[in-house]
Amino acid sequence: MKSLSFLNHEFEAFPSPELALTDPNGLLAIGGDLRPERLLSAYYNGIFPWFNSDDPILWWSPDPRAVFIPGEIHISTSLRKYLKKQPWRITINHAFTDVMAGCAQPREKQSGTWITQEIQMAYRELHHTGHAHSIEVWEGERLIGGLYGLAIGQVFCGESMFHRKTNASKAAVAALQQHLLKMGFKLIDAQVMNPHLESLGAKAIKRIDFITLLSELRNNPLDPATWTTKEVILELE
């Protein structure tokens, strides 16, 4: 039976994602807080927060789930040619706070953002504890694009991306895929399907299948150097 849970500020286990509502799709719980242990518990169980600034905290686990398989993200021939011509520099974990701020800027035709100051503070704390990570794209000293997300074992949970120059966010995606492949990641959680994700090769899978994959991969160990600050050289051949 589908049901909506209400969380208080006491830390408690999340309900099973299978209890999430079908309308709105995936809404599982309301309330609680964004302390690191609660956020990590959420992602560990296939749940993520998403809410507007005037809403309570809303927790989601939609069905179906949008995912990428590292190595199967579509980087078109024209995009490869374009990126080869750019003098851009790409880094990992050089400017997490600035990437989040870039992602928080309202999109065209949008008046607000779900990446509130509360969200930014919570994920900065996860970054400081080694759980949240960023990819940055630079033109000279100017940050022109990037993305951020969480690593849960061999699963990367993508949260948001932004660009200030055409295709800069796609460069970040290409760099992320290349890095995850080298480091043995098996899955990228993209949460909710949309036309842009679909154009990049995202697949919609049943929630139960996503949770099964997550449970198989979330405890797998990684190279300790996986998320050290570094530069990425795109391999676009």
Curated annotation (Swiss-Prot):
Record GO biological process: protein catabolic process
EC class name: transferase
Gene Ontology MF term list: leucyl-tRNA--protein transferase activity
EC nos: 2.3.2.6
Cited Pfam families: Leu_Phe_trans
Cited function: Functions in the N-end rule pathway of protein degradation where it conjugates Leu, Phe and, less efficiently, Met from aminoacyl-tRNAs to the N-termini of proteins containing an N-terminal arginine or lysine.
Protein name: Leucyl/phenylalanyl-tRNA--protein transferase
Organism listed in the record: Shewanella baltica (strain OS195)
Gene: aat
